[in-house]
Amino acid sequence: TLYIKDDDSRLSFLQGNFITMTNMKDKDIDKMIKYRISPVNISVHSTNPDLRVKMLNNRFAGDIESKIKRLNDAGIEMNAQIVCVPGYNDKSELERTVNDLAKYSENLGSIAVVPVGITKFRENLENLDIFDKDSSRELIGQIKRMQEHFLSEFGRRFVFASDEFYVLAELPLPEYEEYEGFSPIENGVGLIKMFE
């Protein structure tokens, strides 16, 4: 019998899905390390434990950084995703999360920042703002400043804004070489550029 749940690490390895790791116990991480399951695609959203618990509405969500550290220390390759929500994990919280994740740049290939998507199915859910032209431009500027820092520190940009931010901001996409091999393309980073 095949048994795969939505947040199953096998989907991350086999199909490129991003997982929150909220349901992973130490034994699950031990297994990933033992079998060298790599790369692992992680939906981080925030390294602030209280904020991550709130955003994911899951009391087990706060220890993401310790899990990332374990994988990094074992040499497991990872990619990170931050679904950015205005008023929650943007601005200073985004800066904090990216800087926290930069400690694991040895095995963390890239961080993709994508805007939150809102559907009409929001009954009994918290009201969320979405990115507009101005807030998208502000976020792109913030990411470009971080990229400049990481280029000088690591020799690579490390963090990328998804193409959707550029569309919302009504700005041209970055140059082809700025995507550095298009590693976070599953997150919509460089997808439009590939068709130019």
Q: Language-model features: where?
A:
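Auxiliary Fe-S-binding modules of radical SAM enzymes
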Residues: 102-104, 112, 117-196
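Conserved Radical SAM active-site core
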Residues: 1-107, 118-146
